[in-house]
Amino acid sequence: MYYNYYLKYYSQSGFFLENNGAIMYNYMYMKTYYIRTYGCQMNLHESEKLAGLLENAGYTLATEPESADIILFVTCCIRENAEQKVYGHIGALKQYKAENPDVVIAVGGCMTQQKSAAEKLKQKFPFVDVIFGTHNLCDFMRLLEEKSGRKKTLIEITEDDCESENTPMTRSSFPNAWVNVIYGCNNFCTYCIVPYVRGRERSRTIPDVVAEVKQLVGSGYKEITLLGQNVNSYGNDLKDGGDFADLLDAIGREVKGKYRLRFMSSHPKDLTERLVAAMARNENVCHLIHLPLQSGSNDVLKRMNRRYTREDYMAKIDLIKKFMPDCAVSTDVMVGFPGESEQDFRDTLDIMEKADFASAFMFVYSRRGGTPADKMPDQIPEEVSKARIMEMVAAQNARTAEHSAAYKGRTIEILCEDFDEKRGMYLGRDEYGRMGYFKSDKDERGNFVNVKVTDTNGISLYCEKI
């Protein structure tokens, strides 16, 4: 999955950023940039920071790469497919770069942080100008300056995280905003490359996060999503204490107004009663939690180093429903992990049915070099994994459709995010993350709108404005 920077993330529809001009500095003409972002919300948020750095230096947003002075790729390496997309899009620029040698092509993000990845990228695409890692975001403008006049690719990959909290930012997802609360991951699941490219966990302080959320709500943002590879680990590294439940309480206590608060992602082993209780008592926190399952087989979970059992996971589901009976739970699930038997797969389908997920991101295991799982025996044949994922998707899609159908006739509140030109309807999400479409005679973007659900289709709700 990738996102052109000018696209609105939640709706993934063509929403061009408004641009009110930029400081000219000493440039003879208005220089432009284009960012293509792959992967998760964390990457999208880092693209907002890179855009802020560029606009602070006088650049303006281009709507196509061919009209930009700087073309920037923010990459993902969570699965092989993500890397292949990056290679394809960079390769497509070879002729354009040859015809426009002054155009700067820069590649950063998780893919480049992998061991030997930068050199591989340089050899494969020698026309790329700058390659930088996940910890070099703060240095991007310096790297551009150092590259000026150099013919060879400039590579800078460091292991020490830069603190990018105060980086200038151009947000692209109004009325939604992303706020990092914790960086990195300490879990080392055997299939996952993230700890190797994102580093160890580092939490921002509660006052720092609260101040950013307060500023965003004061500026008119209506939905704030707190981000981290594992938000449930928030505060473990802070000397003065405070965990994620304390953070939710602090935001609820100090940030007033009508807004929604979401967060992602949560590791099941770290989901506590304290946190679930904090969700329940803070009225701005949405009753939606993304709780990655990955597998419903205890044997597979052990080989994944997930550090919980299927019984532990279902206990977390029961805990959530105890405090918030209406809470929607979404998840991540993979098939085809090394050694996954037919019974392991059936165990996963069983727990998906019992947990009754509102929605799920389902995918086939992807080998990642440098992870323990890559060296495990009994890699699953592609045809077996494909058959399993098709069966899983069909079962979950039917379940998701049932969840949607239960909405019919209900009145819900939607935060309007965009206008769908093809449908001729406004769109937005309710508290539980369900997408709703409706018509209105006025521009509703950024507004909370009460609607009645008249029909459903899969995950979508079709509504009438009240």
Spans of features found by a protein language model:
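Generic beta-strand/beta-sheet core signal
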Residues: 36, 227-229, 264-266, 292-294, ...
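Radical SAM enzyme [4Fe-4S]-AdoMet core and its adjacent flexible, acidic
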Residues: 40, 235-254, 304-307, 367-398
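Conserved SAM/AdoMet-binding glycine-rich loop
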Residues: 104-107, 114-116, 218-342, 353
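Short flexible coil/turn linkers enriched for glycine and charged/polar residues
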Residues: 172-175, 185-187, 285, 295, ...
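Proteins enriched for Cys/Gly/acidic motifs involved in redox and nucleic-acid/cofactor modification
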Residues: 25-234, 274, 311-322, 346, ...
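Conserved, mostly hydrophobic/aromatic
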Residues: 189, 209, 226, 263, ...
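Short, positively charged and aromatic/hydrophobic N-terminal segments
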Residues: 2-10, 15-26
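Terminal RNA-binding accessory module
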Residues: 375-466
